[in-house]
């Protein structure tokens, strides 16, 4: 299956590839200092960054280099965030996940719902047996989400990221599948 054709649905959400029409909403999300506080880049400064990101995304997805899906509210069709699967090693059946959510939607269980569906998709359609996540040590909400999904803390890497003027560490979480994710 082409990554561009993937659709994953839950009761409240639709996960689908990004489209150029998402650029303004994607910029709004990724220009937020709150959303990007623990991200691997500074907040975006222009709509062009969102447009270029979506174009790059389409190219990478066509090559199956990673899988990034927009998280859409089925009731309003609003872009709420995204889930991504990257650094995929098919022979080892493992890869990394990431996610972000607009602050307007945080604290409602939305990302947990999205990630359960996303991880189930990865396990079912890509035969993934191991997932990893790399988070900032201060990102307590993300650590809580990962633990609710069954991930375990596996390591701590010092001075892993430089974003702007800040050098930060990383906590590494891992999940062995076929554990059922709920």
Language-model segment annotations:
Residues 1-33, 37, 72-182:
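Acyl-donor (CoA/ACP) binding surface of acyl/acetyltransferases
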Residues 34-56, 67:
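Conserved GNAT-fold acetyl-CoA-binding loop/helix
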Residues 46-48, 61, 180:
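A short hydrophobic/aromatic micro-motif that marks alpha-helical segments and, especially, helix-coil
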Residues 56-60, 121:
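A generic secondary-structure signal
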Residues 59-64, 151:
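Short loop/turn motifs at secondary-structure junctions and domain boundaries
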């Amino acid at each position: 299956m082409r990554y561009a054709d993937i659709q994953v649905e839950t009761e409240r959400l639709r996960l689908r590839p990004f489209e150029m029409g998402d650029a303004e909403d994607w910029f709004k999300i990724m220009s937020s200092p709150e959303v990007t506080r623990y991200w691997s880049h500074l907040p975006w400064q222009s709509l062009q960054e969102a447009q270029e990101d979506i174009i790059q995304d389409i190219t990478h997805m066509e090559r199956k280099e990673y899988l990034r899906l927009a998280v859409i509210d089925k009731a309003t069709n609003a872009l709420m965030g995204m889930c991504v699967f990257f650094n995929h090693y098919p022979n080892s059946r493992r890869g990394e996940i990431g996610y972000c959510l607009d602050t307007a939607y945080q604290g409602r269980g939305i990302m947990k719902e999205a990630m359960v569906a996303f991880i189930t998709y990865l396990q079912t359609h890509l035969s993934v047996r191991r997932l990893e996540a790399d988070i900032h040590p201060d990102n307590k909400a993300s650590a809580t989400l990962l633990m609710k999904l069954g991930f375990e803390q596996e390591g701590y890497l010092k001075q892993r990221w430089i974003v702007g003027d800040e050098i930060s560490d990383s906590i590494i979480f891992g999940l062995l599948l076929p554990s059922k994710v709920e």
